[in-house]
Amino acid sequence: MQHPAEHSPLGKSSQYIAEYSPELLFPISRTSKWAELGLDGANLPYQGVDYWNCYELSWLLPSGKPVVAIGEFAIPADSPNIIESKSFKLYLNSLNQTVFASWGELQATLARDLSAVAGKPVAVRLRSLTEVAGEGVATLPGQCIDELEISVTQYAHPQPELLRCDASRVVEESLHSHLLKSNCPVTGQPDWGSLVVQYRGAALDHASLLAYLVSFRQHADFHEQCVERIFLDLQRLLQPQSLTVYARYVRRGGLDINPYRSTEALRVDNARLVRQ
């Protein structure tokens, strides 16, 4: 079956347009991947957001002087569409030789265009380099599981059967790993990520979680669907009172993608990690 991104700019030679071109944005419906995971878009078992951070954002003032900034975009996890990443990059590059009278005008333009393609309101925040530089680099909450001893032989597809828990013990804990890797389903390029699991429920075996995450290593899927698959596999196993799965991926093409899925109200810390 042809992947819905096959008609996107991914994996194709592209002309870089330097003047405002919102038509470059390419939507990819979430519906087919939701169906693959047994989800109904009208009744999702989580709340969430996809945080995109742009480090290659520039435009012109009326004087012709360039401005640079860092852009933060929050796309609702229940939006009908994701925005294909290369088309997002091409769209942002089309702002390079475009005049905007103010930061506010650009922010409103970005929010309008991205919301139209995603199918739900997208929150946009533009930040100065000085503001972001003052925040430094964050660390993930909880215990890192990457030094645990595991044995792994299969990497082609996620293996939820590796996950184990102790149903006789209920715990509340935060775990994280920097060993998440999957591949772009169109180009095959590697996607490197760090992942947080926060939950209250049956005690999860930490080594089994690490082995499970490593089983994604050759799996081909987008960032958002990988996080949703992890959320659902953990939810089925743990039957938790609360569960949050949050991944922060290494940037490509000046963009990083950070999907967040939770049973709880959104409390997202969009703080950059050392690899971002």
UniProtKB/Swiss-Prot annotation:
Active site: 184 (thioimide intermediate), 191 (proton donor)
Single GO term (MF): preQ1 synthase activity
Pfam families hit by this protein: QueF, QueF_N
Binding site for substrate: 83-85, 223-224
Subcellular location per the Swiss-Prot or TrEMBL entry: Cytoplasm
InterPro entries: GTP-CH-I_C/QueF, NADPH_dep_7-cyano-7-deazaG_red, QueF, QueF_N, QueF_type2
UniProt-annotated binding residues for NADPH: 85-86, 252-253
Main location: cytoplasm
Enzyme Commission number: 1.7.1.13
GO cellular component terms given for this protein: cytoplasm
Catalytic reaction list: 7-aminomethyl-7-carbaguanine + 2 NADP(+) = 7-cyano-7-deazaguanine + 2 NADPH + 3 H(+)
Enzyme kind, highest EC tier: oxidoreductase
Keywords from the named record: Cytoplasm, NADP, Oxidoreductase, Queuosine biosynthesis
Superkingdom of the source species: Bacteria
Pathway, per record: tRNA modification; tRNA-queuosine biosynthesis
GO BP: any one term: tRNA modification
Claim: DNA damage is one of the keywords in the record: no
Statement: the UniProt record of this protein carries the keyword DNA-binding: no
Family in the record: Belongs to the GTP cyclohydrolase I family. QueF type 2 subfamily.
Classification via NCBIfam families: QueF (TIGR03138)
Assembly description: Homodimer.
Function description: Catalyzes the NADPH-dependent reduction of 7-cyano-7-deazaguanine (preQ0) to 7-aminomethyl-7-deazaguanine (preQ1).
Protein name: NADPH-dependent 7-cyano-7-deazaguanine reductase
Organism: Ectopseudomonas mendocina (strain ymp)
